[in-house]
Amino acid sequence: MAVQLVLNFIIAVFWLFVTNSYTTNNFVLGFIFGLVLVYLLHRVLPGRFYVITLYRIIKLIIIFLIELIKANFDVLKIIIKPSIKNEPGFFVYHTDLKKDWQIVLLSNLITLTPGTVVLGVSDDRTKIYIHAIDFSTKEQEVESIKTSLEKIVREVGEI
């Protein structure tokens, strides 16, 4: 991916020199021209076409921000309630992710959402130990992690 992106920037800068016009519009035109060239050459360049990976990373960021906003509202509801009826507790989340960086990324995303903290990962890397501020919603929490965060982390990892 990095090789393709650097090559695209080199083509865009080369386009500026060839056209002898150093404007932003011309750079964008050169970048689009480079994008087409990199796409035509992506079979001989290492890795998957970088736009696909870039799209997946942007999708990961958007999904995480949505989950972050939802978790903020959940914690806000707990804080605003006059009586405390939440049940904090620990649970084990079983993951299917294989690569270490994917497990670390998922753990960080879980920790960054309010109301949950990852305490550790098992030695065989199949279980993530999580503390939740409201244990009564464990099934919802597991389903939310499985269908959104873990799914998109797996997609980003498919190279």
UniProtKB/Swiss-Prot annotation:
The organism's place on the tree of life at top rank: Bacteria
Membrane-crossing residue ranges in chain numbering: 1-21, 27-47, 49-69, 101-121
UniProt KW Membrane keyword: yes
Compartments, record wording: Cell membrane
Any matching Pfam family: MNHE
Predominant location: membrane
GO biological process: proton transmembrane transport; sodium ion transport
GO molecular function, one term: antiporter activity
Membrane topology: Multi-pass membrane protein
Recorded GO CC terms: plasma membrane
Record's keyword annotation contains tRNA processing: no
Keywords, alphabetical: Antiport, Cell membrane, Hydrogen ion transport, Ion transport, Membrane, Sodium, Sodium transport, Transmembrane, Transmembrane helix, Transport
Subunit structure: May form a heterooligomeric complex that consists of seven subunits: mnhA1, mnhB1, mnhC1, mnhD1, mnhE1, mnhF1 and mnhG1.
Function statement: Mnh complex is a Na(+)/H(+) antiporter involved in Na(+) excretion.
PANTHER family on file: NA(+)/H(+) ANTIPORTER SUBUNIT E1 (PTHR34584), NA(+)_H(+) ANTIPORTER SUBUNIT E1 (PTHR34584:SF1)
Family from the record: Belongs to the CPA3 antiporters (TC 2.A.63) subunit E family.
Protein name: Na(+)/H(+) antiporter subunit E1
Organism field: Staphylococcus aureus (strain bovine RF122 / ET3-1)
Protein's gene: mnhE1
